């Protein structure tokens, strides 16, 4: 009798593990669909602000990279 109850508990534990494995992707999909439902496209004003910010960032990174290159060219020739 004790053996039958042990097998029943093992089966319950394995069912719980399977439920936990299945629950994670289902929860992920549910939360993802809720997030996408809340999202909206930016209006023209917001879009232009984003484009300006990204453009300024590209220009700033380019200027910094160019300045670093200008500094390292003479240093490279002094070392070599």
From Swiss-Prot:
Topology, Extracellular side: 76-80
Superkingdom classification of source: Eukaryota
Transmembrane stretches, start-end: 47-75
Protein's UniProt keywords contain Transmembrane helix: yes
Membrane topology field: Single-pass membrane protein
Main location as per UniProt: endoplasmic reticulum
GO cellular component: endoplasmic reticulum; endoplasmic reticulum membrane; nuclear inner membrane; rough endoplasmic reticulum membrane; Sec61 translocon complex; Ssh1 translocon complex; translocon complex
A GO molecular-function descriptor: structural molecule activity
GO terms classed as biological process: post-translational protein targeting to membrane, translocation; SRP-dependent cotranslational protein targeting to membrane; SRP-dependent cotranslational protein targeting to membrane, translocation
SUPFAM superfamilies the record matches: Preprotein translocase SecE subunit
Cytoplasmic topology ranges: 1-46
Compartment(s) of residence: Endoplasmic reticulum membrane
Key words of the record: Endoplasmic reticulum, Membrane, Protein transport, Translocation, Transmembrane, Transmembrane helix, Transport
Family to which the UniProt record says this protein belongs: Belongs to the SecE/SEC61-gamma family.
Self-association state and partner proteins as the record states: Component of the heterotrimeric Sec61 complex, which is composed of SSH1, SBH1 and SSS1. Presumably three to four Sec61 heterotrimers assemble into an oligomeric ring with a central aqueous pore. In cotranslational ER import, the pore diameter varies from 9-15 A in a ribosome-free resting state to 40-60 A in a functional state when associated with the ribosome. The Sec61 complex is part of a channel-forming translocon complex whose composition seem to change dependent upon different functional states.
Annotated HAMAP family: SecE
Record function comment: Part of the Sec61 complex, which is the major component of channel-forming translocon complex that mediates protein translocation across the endoplasmic reticulum (ER). The functional states of the translocon complex include co- and post-translational ER import, cotranslational membrane protein integration and retrograde transport of misfolded proteins out of the ER. In the cotranslational pathway, ribosomes synthesizing presecretory proteins are targeted to the translocon by the cytosolic signal recognition particle (SRP) and its ER-localized receptor.
Protein name, UniProt field: Protein transport protein SSS1
Source organism of this protein record: Saccharomyces cerevisiae (strain ATCC 204508 / S288c) (Baker's yeast)
Gene: SSS1
């Amino acid at each position: 009798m004790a053996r039958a109850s042990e097998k029943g508990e093992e089966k319950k534990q394995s069912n719980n593990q399977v439920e936990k494995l299945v629950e994670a992707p289902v929860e992920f999909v549910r939360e993802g669909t809720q997030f996408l439902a809340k999202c909206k496209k930016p209006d023209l004003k917001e879009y232009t602000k984003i484009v300006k910010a990204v453009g300024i960032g590209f220009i700033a990174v380019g200027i910094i990279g160019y300045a670093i290159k200008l500094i390292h060219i003479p240093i490279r020739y002094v070392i070599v």
